[in-house]
Regions:
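Walker B catalytic acidic pair
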Residues: 27, 33-35, 45
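Basic, amphipathic alpha-helical bundle interface domains used for macromolecular binding and assembly
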Residues: 16-17, 40-198
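Residues immediately C-terminal
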Residues: 30-31, 37-38, 122
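P-loop NTPase switch/communication element
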Residues: 1-12, 70-71, 79
Length: 198
């Protein structure tokens, strides 16, 4: 959906409730490009379905429940102009902070994996691995095999994917040794993780 999409179009609604984009993406991917450009009110309606994997739409006469088990993938620039860290960037630190603050902490807590993609010079992008200087990339087939193996490991261990495990099941199937607990504790401190984010 485009960043001008309304909350009703995104999660569903109307006088006769109809499913929105999140239900249409059930068991699939919902991609939101230019995330901070969406109105904050629209983004905040994602919090409930990201947690419960469904959306409840209440009207005077009835409530409608729609499935919403989707994988959210969102993209954003590092600053309003998109050139943070480059001589082309003219954004002030305050503009960068306001831009990033358009996405609330509670919504960010529900996004499990956040990756910053650094700017790469064009010569790096066009170099090939065979030239000895290019970016070392896995083929799609290699990535597919790693993902397939990881999913099978999860299914063998708990009978379901990690994302579908309850807190109790995580405690039962994902026991940690002391070294791992120490690493996680340091990560919580360093990254400022909340209980939900952890």
């Amino acid at each position: 959906p485009h960043h001008t999409t309304s909350a009703v179009a995104l999660v569903g609604g109307g006088s006769i409730p109809r499913p929105g984009e999140i239900s249409l993406a059930h068991h699939g991917v919902l991609f939101l490009d230019e995330l901070p450009e969406f109105p904050r009110k629209v983004l905040e309606v994602l919090r409930e379905p990201l947690e419960s994997r469904e959306i409840m739409i209440s009207r005077v006469n009835a409530q409608s429940r729609f499935p919403a088990n989707f994988q959210l993938i969102a993209a954003m620039n590092p600053c309003p102009c998109g050139f943070l860290g480059s001589s082309r960037c003219r954004c002030t630190p305050d503009q960068v902070r306001r831009y990033k603050d358009k996405i609330s902490g509670p919504l960010l807590d529900r996004i499990d994996l956040q990756v910053e993609v650094p700017h790469l010079p064009s010569e790096k992008l066009i170099q090939t691995k065979t030239e000895g200087k290019g970016i070392d990339c896995e083929s799609s087939a290699e990535v597919y095999q790693r993902v397939k193996t990881a999913r099978q490991h999860q299914l063998n261990r708990a009978g379901k994917l990690n994302a579908l495990m309850s807190n109790q099941e995580v405690m039962e199937h994902c026991t940690l040794d002391n070294e791992t607990k120490d690493l996680l504790n340091r990560a919580i401190q360093k990254l400022g993780l909340t209980a939900r984010g952890f």
